[in-house]
């Protein structure tokens, strides 16, 4: 049974394991069945191919009916097949029996020793300890140095890895087990081919004395040409795959280019024909990894198939040279055919032929240069492994040279004792491919961590600077607030002083009832409380809106993070798909190699048949039966080729199906990527809309501030007008009072003078009439005069009292004027302060707007960075999960295969032991037969010609050689089985350790990921909170400033009105003595005006309460809708969020997160509806307020300018509604002051 194949072990990249089985099972030369098995076990070939033919040789059983060939089966080595075919072609029945029956090798031990010593010094560094026998085998003998060892050493001259093919007899019952154990990689197949070629040469040279047949290797050169075709197919597949990967990279764009894992320096982007040189040092490093025996051999040992990959530009000429070298390796030495019958010089002739006639191989390889270059490149890639290997190789070479110089009889069993621990140490080294993949993953994780840490540090520094600026702004605002409070306390103190002065007046408390003043104060307090409540409501609304927007931003950030994780996972999936495609291509290439090898075998067999026919013409009578057998063999080979082609077609179909599946997976991945990009665009749109809303609100606030400034300026102008009018009123009042006093005194004097004159006239008449009565009445008249004098005195006293009262009133007026001048000065100072503060606030608002824009840009950058970080983390998690799944599956498969192999090995060991015992018995029989035949030969020498004696001797020698070869094959099978066991155990241990390492690394990666996400979330939350706090504080400061301005305006107006009322009441009290009726009418008029004012205020308060209620309803509706939308979004987030061990990271394998609906569209519609509703309410309130103001201000001289432009926000509407009632009150008070004048 002959099999070539490759086996994949250890997961994604399998370490190859060579196994070659060459078994021929014959019961006898003429009648038993010969079975040949050629297969590729493992993943590449699903079943082997067997063919059998029957040989019917005539006359052979009569000669050897009682010999060893009567046994049911014969095990033939692969090296003896050439000799057996030559003997069959020539009709040499004794030669065939010589191959099938064991006998003495006929080769001197010293000659074999010399040939090995000639081979070893030339290539010390390429010695393979695995090909040497082990001391642990008790059946091994120092003289039984097999030809496989020689072939391994000869293969070193061809720059081929010295992994000798293991030869084992295969039983028909256990062909399935041999399929599993016969797996090997392409490189080992090439090694086996070169070993077969070199091993066939000495056996061909043995018969040079007899038949003068030229020695040439047929199978290897055909195999090499087929391997070149396979390598071409491999290159085409790899180029196609890399083109597909490049297209995918271009579609992904900058994301993949930014976060892709750098390829290994040993691998090239495309295996084009122009990128490879003609030197062996350009061979990729990955081709020599994971090959058993590479740990013991030198780093520069490269298989022939790999060397052919380095000559693509000169593919045809190099192939011709190589094929020519393999077809005619001894083209110049055909004259040097062996002519002597002795076998002592076989090895010398063989070495001469090999060393003198190899133009093709010397043409391709530069041994010294390539050796050093390859060793240096391997050290650059993996310095630790190379140094160990070189040391081990040097020690091995020294030991080999020492052992070869000793005697072969005494020291051969102890030659390799020192090599076993070294080989075990070298075999325990881990493969480079697994290490490099782990190193690249670890380095990528470290780079991502460092990038993220740097970004976080920069963000922390920026936020610390922003915090410092916010603290300074808060300090300035607090200082300004304290100044405002001090000013308000001073104003309240002046107001209280004015009220105490007014309370000291005499007739005020009697004229105006205290109840009305109390009600007026209560109404004012209620209005102030309502205004404060409105301000609190506005503040709460703004805070709720900001909080909701924070939550929305957090959700957007989470969605972006999930999208980035998904993108990374898709990138990793693409990489795994590419790896699987590469594996499939390798399988296809190996299958093509098998097909090409079968074609080569056919061609070689046909050539052998032609040569045999040429030689058989003189001996047709003896070889007619053998020609029939060869014809049957040819037919069976053709059938086998047909079966192999069928299997190749089936494997191709399977590979096509796999490719279709991979393309479908790639399309699914593309669709997922498109969906993710759409979701990212939607999130960006929502972010832009939120930013526009914030900017609109800021613009509205600036417009409101401008309106308030204009209103303040108008109020200042109105105050100045009122002050001018008050001064004119005071001057007029003073003149009127003075005129009234003078007129009253003049009138009183005139009336008194007229009365006295009338009385004097009457008395004078009476004196004239009654001169007599006057004297009697003188006393009465004197009394009357005294009474008149007392009256005059009383009138004079009254005049003095009135003059004193006027002086007091003048003093009071002077005091009032002084207070007015002081208040005017204070007003001017406060106005200046307000103007300066307004300017500062405007500048601060501009700076705050700039900072807000900067914060928004920084937030966008942070979100982008977070998206990038989450994408990386997602891709890493995906790779870890896929690697774990692959390792679990690989571990399970390996365990199952190891169990099967152990069982099959146990069974085979039993069978081999049985065969070994059987062969021992056979050897004993052969020795007995040999002794009997020697006696028969001595008797037959007299009668039989010398040629028969020679043929019998050769027959016996061949029989002994066959038995020895079968024994050695059994020993090698046992050794290979033990090695396979050890290798399987080591692979299981390595896989377990690798799984544990991966689990630990995954735990560490998840822990680092959680820490990074928590830090990022905390920082983002802190930054958002800080930005929101700054906005809230600025809004609160602006609201407080507006409230303070309003309070100042209202307090100033109230004080002015109270002063005017006090002055008017004093004037009324003075005028009341002379003009009671006029004063009564005036009081009634004032009362009516006051009642109208109270009604107007009540109506305005009712309207304000209505507006506040409407705003409260709107705010409640908004909060309810926002809570509903928030609950929906949370519900969808929880529904789509996958479950993992960590709470922060979602399951990346969940596909629902990619197809879920986007929620913020509904939010936008709700917000638009609420804004339209608020606009309608604002228009209604504006119309009502303008109508009321127009109705109340028709009779006034000065009208307050109405707000011409209204913003679309609810905050501006509330500010306008709060400001308008104060202007209405001022207008009504002005009307009250102007009506009496």
From Swiss-Prot:
Basic and acidic residues bias spans: 1-11
Biased composition (Low complexity): 493-502
InterPro entries noted in UniProt: C144A/B/C, CC144C-like_CC_dom, DUF3496
Residue numbers spanned by region Disordered: 1-26, 120-181, 403-435, 480-519
Compositionally skewed regions (Polar residues) per UniProt: 129-150, 167-178, 403-417
Coiled-coil annotated residue ranges, if any: 440-595, 636-939, 965-1042
Key words of the record: Coiled coil
Family, similarity comment: Belongs to the CCDC144 family.
UniProt name for this protein: Putative coiled-coil domain-containing protein 144C
Biological classification of the source: Eukaryota, Metazoa, Chordata, Craniata, Vertebrata
Gene name as annotated: CCDC144CP
């Amino acid at each position: 049974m002959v099999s070539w194949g490759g086996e994949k072990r250890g997961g994604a990249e399998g370490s190859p394991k060579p196994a070659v089985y060459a078994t021929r099972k014959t019961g006898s030369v003429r009648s038993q069945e010969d079975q040949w098995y050629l297969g590729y076990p493992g993943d590449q070939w699903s079943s082997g191919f067997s063919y059998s033919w029957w040989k019917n040789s005539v006359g052979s059983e009569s000669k050897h009916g009682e010999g060893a060939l009567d046994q049911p089966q014969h095990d033939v080595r692969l090296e003896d097949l050439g000799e057996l075919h030559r003997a069959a072609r020539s009709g040499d029945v004794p030669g065939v029996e010589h191959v099938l029956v064991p006998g003495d090798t006929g080769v001197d031990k010293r000659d074999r020793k010399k040939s090995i010593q000639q081979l070893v010094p030339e290539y010390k560094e390429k010695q393979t300890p695995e090909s040497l026998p082990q001391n642990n085998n008790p059946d091994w003998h120092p003289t039984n140095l097999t030809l496989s060892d020689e072939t391994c050493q000869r293969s070193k001259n061809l720059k081929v890895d010295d992994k000798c093919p293991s030869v084992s007899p295969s039983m028909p019952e256990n062909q399935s087990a041999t399929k599993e154990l016969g797996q090997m990689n392409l490189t080992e197949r090439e090694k086996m081919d070169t070993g077969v070629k070199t091993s066939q040469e000495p056996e061909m040279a043995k018969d040079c004395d007899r038949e003068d047949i030229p020695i040439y290797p047929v199978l290897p050169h055909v195999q090499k040409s087929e391997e070149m075709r396979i390598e071409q197919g491999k290159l085409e597949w790899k180029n196609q795959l890399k083109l597909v990967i490049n297209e995918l990279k271009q579609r992904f764009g900058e994301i993949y280019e930014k976060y892709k894992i750098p390829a290994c320096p040993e691998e090239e982007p495309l295996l084009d024909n122009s990128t490879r040189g003609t030197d062996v040092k350009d061979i990729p490093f990955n081709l020599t990894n994971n090959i058993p025996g590479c740990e013991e051999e030198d780093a520069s040992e490269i298989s022939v198939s790999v060397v052919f990959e380095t000559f693509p530009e000169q593919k045809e000429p190099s192939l011709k040279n190589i094929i020519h070298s393999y077809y005619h390796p001894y083209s110049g030495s055909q004259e040097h055919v062996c002519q002597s019958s002795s076998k002592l010089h076989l090895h010398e002739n063989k070495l001469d032929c090999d060393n003198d006639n190899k133009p093709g191989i010397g043409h391709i390889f530069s041994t010294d240069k390539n050796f050093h270059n390859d060793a240096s490149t391997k050290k650059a890639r993996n310095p630790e492994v190379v140094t160990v290997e070189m040391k081990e190789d040097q020690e091995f070479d020294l030991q080999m040279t020492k052992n070869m110089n000793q005697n072969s009889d005494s020291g051969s069993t102890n030659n390799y004792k020192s090599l076993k621990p070294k080989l075990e140490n070298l075999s325990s080294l881990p493969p480079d491919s697994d290490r490099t993949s782990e190193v690249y993953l670890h380095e990528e994780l470290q780079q991502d961590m460092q990038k993220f840490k740097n970004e976080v540090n920069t963000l922390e520094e920026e936020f610390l600077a922003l915090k410092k600026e916010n603290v300074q702004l808060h300090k300035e605002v607090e200082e300004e607030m304290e100044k405002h409070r001090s000013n308000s306390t001073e104003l309240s103190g002046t107001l209280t002083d004015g009220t105490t002065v007014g309370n000291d007046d005499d007739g005020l408390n009697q004229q105006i009832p205290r109840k009305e003043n109390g009600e007026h104060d209560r109404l004012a307090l209620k209005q102030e409380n309502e205004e404060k409540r409105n301000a609190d409501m506005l503040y709460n609304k703004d805070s709720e809106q900001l909080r909701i927007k924070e939550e929305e931003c957090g959700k957007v950030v989470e969605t972006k993070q999930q999208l980035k994780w998904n993108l990374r996972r898709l990138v990793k999936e693409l990489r795994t798909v590419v790896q699987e495609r590469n594996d499939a291509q390798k399988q296809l290439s190996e299958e093509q190699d098998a097909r090409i090898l079968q074609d080569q075998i056919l061609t070689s067999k046909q050539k052998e048949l032609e040569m045999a026919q040429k030689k058989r013409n003189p001996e047709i009578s003896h070889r007619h039966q053998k020609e029939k057998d060869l014809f049957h063999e040819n037919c069976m080979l053709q059938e086998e080729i047909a079966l192999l082609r069928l299997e190749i077609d089936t494997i191709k179909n399977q590979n096509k199906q796999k490719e279709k599946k991979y393309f479908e997976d790639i399309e699914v991945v593309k669709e997922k990527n498109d969906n993710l990009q759409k979701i990212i665009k939607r999130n960006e749109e929502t972010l832009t809309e939120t930013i526009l809303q914030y900017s609109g609100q800021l613009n509205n606030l600036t417009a409101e501030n401008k309106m308030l400034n204009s209103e303040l300026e108008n109020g200042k102008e109105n105050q100045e007008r009122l002050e001018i009018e008050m001064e004119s009123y005071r001057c007029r009042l003073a003149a009127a009072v003075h005129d009234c006093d003078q007129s009253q005194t003049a009138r009183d004097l005139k009336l008194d003078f007229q009365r006295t004159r009338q009385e004097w006239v009457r008395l004078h008449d009476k004196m004239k009439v009654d001169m007599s009565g006057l004297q009697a009445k003188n006393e009465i008249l004197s009394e009357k005069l005294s009474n008149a004098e007392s009256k005059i005195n009383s009138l004079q006293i009254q005049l003095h009292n009135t003059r004193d009262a006027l002086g007091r009133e003048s003093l009071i007026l002077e005091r009032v004027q002084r207070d007015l001048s002081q208040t005017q000065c204070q007003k001017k100072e406060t106005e200046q302060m307000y103007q300066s503060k307004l300017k500062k606030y405007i500048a601060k608002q501009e700076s705050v707007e700039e900072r807000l824009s900067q914060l928004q840009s920084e937030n966008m950058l942070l979100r982008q960075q977070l998206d990038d970080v989450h994408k990386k983390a997602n891709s890493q998690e995906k790779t870890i999960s896929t690697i774990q799944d692959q390792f679990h599956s690989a571990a399970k498969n390996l365990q199952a295969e190891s169990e099967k192999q152990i069982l099959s090995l146990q069974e085979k060991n039993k069978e081999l032991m049985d065969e070994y015992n059987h062969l021992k018995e056979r050897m004993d029989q052969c020795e007995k037969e040999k002794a009997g035949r020697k006696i028969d030969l001595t008797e037959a020498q007299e009668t039989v010609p010398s040629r028969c004696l020679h043929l019998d001797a050769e027959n016996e020698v061949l029989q002994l050689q066959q038995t020895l070869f079968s024994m050695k094959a059994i020993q090698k099978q046992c050794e290979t089985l033990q090695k396979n066991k050890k290798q399987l155990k080591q692979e299981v241990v390595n896989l377990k350790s690798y799984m544990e390492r991966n689990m630990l690394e995954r735990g560490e990666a998840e822990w680092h990921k959680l820490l990074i996400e928590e830090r990022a979330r905390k920082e983002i939350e802190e930054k958002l909170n800080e930005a929101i706090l700054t906005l809230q504080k600025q809004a609160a400061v602006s609201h407080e400033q507006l409230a303070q301005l309003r309070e100042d305006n209202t307090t100033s107006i109230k004080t002015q009105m109270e002063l005017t009322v006090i002055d008017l009441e004093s004037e009324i009290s003075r005028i009341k003595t002379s003009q009671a009726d006029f004063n009564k009418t005036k009081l009634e008029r004032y009362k009516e005006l006051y009642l109208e004012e109270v009604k107007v205020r009540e109506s305005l308060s009712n309207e304000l309460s209505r507006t506040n209620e409407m705003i409260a309803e709107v705010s409640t509706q908004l909060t309810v809708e926002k809570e509903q939308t928030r609950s929906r979004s949370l519900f969808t987030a929880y529904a789509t969020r996958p479950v993992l061990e960590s709470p922060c990271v979602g399951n990346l394998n969940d596909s629902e997160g990619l197809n879920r609906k986007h929620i913020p569209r509904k939010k936008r519609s709700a917000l638009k509806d609420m804004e339209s509703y608020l606009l309608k309410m604002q228009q209604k309130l504006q119309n009502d307020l303008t109508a009321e103001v127009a109705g109340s201000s028709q009779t006034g001289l000065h009208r307050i300018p109405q707000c011409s432009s209204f913003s679309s926000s609810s905050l501006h509407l509330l500010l306008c509604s709060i400001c308008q009632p104060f202007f209405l009150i001022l207008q009504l008070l002005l009307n009250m002051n102007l009506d009496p004048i």
